[in-house]
Amino acid sequence: MLLEQQKQLISLIQAAVAQCLPEAQAQVQLERPKVAAHGDIATNVAMQLAKPARRNPRELAQGIVDALMAQPQARELIQDAEIAGPGFINFRLTPAARQAVVQAVASQADAYGRAPRNGEKVLVEFVSANPTGPLHVGHARQAALGDAICRLYDASGWDVTREFYYNDAGNQIDNLAISVQARGRGIAPDAPDYPTDGYKGDYIVEIARDFAARKSVQASDGQPVTATGDLDSLDDIRAFAVAYLRREQDLDLQAFGLAFDNYFLESSLYASGRVQETVDTLVAKGHTYEEGGALWLRTTELGTGDDKDRVMRKSEGGYTYFVPDVAYHKVKWERGFHHAVNIQGSDHHGTVARVRAGLQGLEAGIPKDFPAYVLHKMVKVMRGGEEVKISKRAGSYVTMRDLIDWVGRDAVRYFLIQRRADTEFVFDIDLALSKSDENPVYYIQYAHARICTMIGNSGASAAEIAQADTALLTAPSEYALLQRLAEFPQVVALAAQELAPHHVAFWLRDCASDFHAWYNAERVLVDEPALKLARLRLAATTRQVLANGLALLGVSAPDRM
């Protein structure tokens, strides 16, 4: 049922309730019955109102139905209504109401499922990998989730900024530099004098080789960095290695079809004095104390749910990692992004309360729930029934590029979105490569391609199909498909509201299933011209909505397979 139809039906039910219970304030909610045979849409409004009104719920439900069906507008939407159980009202839509989705999709096309612009803006930060190695499968899940969430925000009317925060300061960058230095000097990872916390993948050898060759590299948002070849200068090695890996990560993201609007460097927070300014403000506001030679933040007193106070400045003098995060999010707020979402691995769970506490301590009018977080669990990669743990180039993990090379970008995106972010996920390489109904990407894309081929072979023109009489679409499998297509805008709205693109992935699978069921139950290219055109119009409508849904996930909609 289209959203506009739902709004109209709710208004009509409220009018019917007012006739039965003039003093009642009806909060009418509609839901789809779990069993299709029970109807197209249902409400429990009679059960809600019966007790305070001291009425029998089934009798009240019958009164509401009688008053409702006396309204001519209701009869245009509702074919019949049935009282079920303790007082549910189940409705069956008229054929015209069911078929209205076809014209809605035709008039809106690519915009079907999208909302008008709302004048709001949001910053979504995701991937945000350390520039210390290739992007791994966890980053791939973050990239898929983040880009889909951005697309959902855009579909919901928001202006979206995609941001990548580079953790280019701290011990991990020093470890990167000394690792490249060691490999440049011919020290192998298994040698006793190789750095204890050094990186061991083959990419370290590649960086060392290019550094010695005095090559130049450039990240997408940076200046060219030319290697000096001086292995005694850790500063030179560090600058080249970071630029090299940022460029490598850029290439991974390009292969994924993902472009960021902005890159923000952690080092810039130190260089600009924002980290020190943040610390000074928290001290001045009285939210810190000294103990054991360290500076502590009173996070337990700042109302964000942290269970103990946290060290800001360690006894040896360095800041803990959440301090620049607080500074960074203050900068986000000052840039006018009063709605921000961070997509991170579940191992960042402990930082949520700390960062929010730091922001509260700044007393800058920032809400306690800023920023919002989507925390995802990690990914296990399986092939041939065994877990794949190691990439030779990365040294200790499967890379994002490995996945793309093995199964393609579309499969990587869909598979990493199809489950809730807070659940662990097993990426089955064999399944992603299979051409079967069990592979959801193949199943959905095949539905789209099958429709394109069917229309191309039909001999009917686009104009003929667009003018077809949808009143002829009355088969049960056609009603089921029409109902599914009508749900799409509400699924998009729900996915955006919950920051949960898996809702769209589920819907796409269900829609493809409904299409294949209809295709197998009813011949499309029948001899009767009017029915043939009507069914081609339903197929074309399905093709459009499948394409819209796939686009929200960053997955292609092929015309042929």
Curated annotation (Swiss-Prot):
One CC-aspect GO term: cytoplasm
Gene Ontology MF terms: arginine-tRNA ligase activity; ATP binding
Principal cellular location given in the protein's record: cytoplasm
GO terms classed as biological process: arginyl-tRNA aminoacylation
Matching InterPro entries: aa-tRNA-synth_I_CS (IPR001412), Arg-tRNA-ligase (IPR001278), Arg-tRNA-synth_N (IPR005148), Arg-tRNA-synth_N_sf (IPR036695), ArgRS_core (IPR035684), DALR_anticod-bd (IPR008909), Rossmann-like_a/b/a_fold (IPR014729), tRNAsynth_Ia_anticodon-bd (IPR009080)
UniProt signal peptide: none
Keywords from the named record: Aminoacyl-tRNA synthetase, ATP-binding, Cytoplasm, Ligase, Nucleotide-binding, Protein biosynthesis
Disulfide bonds: none
Lineage top rank: taxon: Bacteria
Class of enzymatic activity (EC top level): ligase
Keyword Ligase tagged: yes
The enzyme's E.C. designation: 6.1.1.19
NCBIfam families according to UniProt: argS (TIGR00456)
The protein's name in its UniProt record: Arginine--tRNA ligase
Lineage: Bacteria, Pseudomonadati, Pseudomonadota, Betaproteobacteria, Burkholderiales
